[in-house]
């Protein structure tokens, strides 16, 4: 079942994110890795900043999360994670499909350039990488992340983003 996460599920969201994010250790730049990957304070800040988490549940247990955040004229997909033991079972696909229905605006996704599996996943579902120049512009305009993260990230956009106004690939 997919539904919007409840406030009282904060600790479960935190657990899912940090369980799945362990995959980044050794892949992303060492100066960007920390344990836990996302602290409770950082998660609270993301929620307070407008990220709404949706969850995939099996028998009332949270197995995966994906956040959605309207920012200016786009919607961002944020913090998409599936418990390690449940990965490659279609959970992220189901969450992405559900969240795409929630947005009337073009969707953008930012991820680490080293997260090749994530990039392939989004490309498989119709998203395309934007040019490096456009990536830098978009990350500065729509995200609040450090310059170091901008330099080591990519942005993917869905087709309607490219169609609605002239952007460079």
Where in this protein do the model-derived segments appear?
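A short beta-loop-alpha structural element at the N-terminal edge
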Residues: 1-15
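Conserved GNAT-fold acetyl-CoA-binding loop/helix
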Residues: 18-43
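A short helix-loop-beta-strand connector motif used in the catalytic cores of GNAT acetyltransferases and
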Residues: 41-54, 149-152
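Conserved beta-strand in the GNAT
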Residues: 55, 61-69, 76-81
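A short, internal acetyl-CoA/4′-phosphopantetheine-binding micro-motif in the GNAT/acyltransferase core
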Residues: 80-87, 111-113
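Conserved acetyl-CoA-binding loop-helix of GNAT-fold acetyltransferases
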Residues: 82, 88-101, 124
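Conserved active-site alpha-helix within GNAT-family acetyltransferase domains
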Residues: 93, 114-149
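Conserved GNAT acetyl-CoA-binding A-motif
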Residues: 101-114
